[in-house]
Design a protein with these regions (language model features):
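Alpha-amylase-like alpha-glycosidases and glucanotransferases acting on alpha-linked glucans and related
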Residues: 1-17
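Carbohydrate-interacting/catalytic domains
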Residues: 18-22, 26, 31-41, 45-47, ...
């Protein structure tokens, strides 16, 4: 790490192991791509490029190996993890484009309605906003008839049980916790979830469901 440049007030955390660290990267990417507005990332973020702690790459003395693009890392022992993170981000971009009606409305306040919910599917109150387990529900009203979207976020260090909205058939489309164990897809099909079930969300994971269009 370059200890000579950058300011000292940094907020960082060593997650202790590489799988957890990559999981948190996927959480950050999914939060960014599912937010309103234009996702903006640094070049190389999609394949886990790092500056090894140097947060001041614009400093003239920072023109060194800490900040260069190390293209050879694609051929390193961790190259398969980098390739799969690249695939994850690419698929996130595709998923966002397919749901622009929710994540990127053309006019402010004109997008699909949504509500912040607790893990118990209740409306958020003042004390709930400081919690680490929440849901975002994009739902239909009199003006909308699109596939609904439910984003479950659990940043606790243990599994949390979420209550899904009633009367809706859900299918899982994203699981940040299991991606690297499941190959070059965002998630494997696991059937549909109906009848207001409970859904266990793993430690420090984001799970996204939507209402699939059934073609008869």
């Amino acid at each position: 790490c370059d200890t000579e440049s950058g300011e000292e007030h940094n907020r960082s955390r060593d997650w202790g192991d590489e799988p957890t660290k990559r999981q948190m990267m996927r959480n950050m990417f999914s939060g960014l791509f599912f937010a309103h507005g234009t996702p903006m990332i640094y070049g190389g973020d999609e394949w886990m490029r790092t500056q090894y702690g140097n947060n001041n790459a614009y400093y003239i003395a920072a023109d060194n190996e800490w900040n260069w693009f190390r293209w050879g890392e694609w051929q390193s022992t961790s190259s398969h993890f980098r390739a799969r993170m690249h695939d994850f981000v690419r698929n996130l971009s595709r998923m966002r484009k397919e749901r622009m009606y929710a994540f990127s409305p053309k006019e402010h306040g004109q997008g699909m309605p949504f509500a912040w919910k607790t893990q118990y599917n209740t409306n958020m109150s003042g004390t709930d906003w400081s919690g680490k387990s929440t849901m975002i529900h994009y739902y239909n009203d009199d003006n909308w008839d699109k596939p609904q979207i439910l984003i479950m976020m659990n940043m606790e260090r243990e599994t949390r049980t979420f209550t899904l909205p009633e009367g809706v058939t859900w299918g899982r489309i994203l699981d940040t916790q299991s991606y690297f164990d499941r190959g070059d897809i965002l998630d494997e099909p696991e059937g549909f979830f109906t009848d207001n079930p409970d859904f266990d969300t793993a430690t420090s994971a984001n799970i996204t469901l939507d209402t699939p269009q059934i073609i008869e």
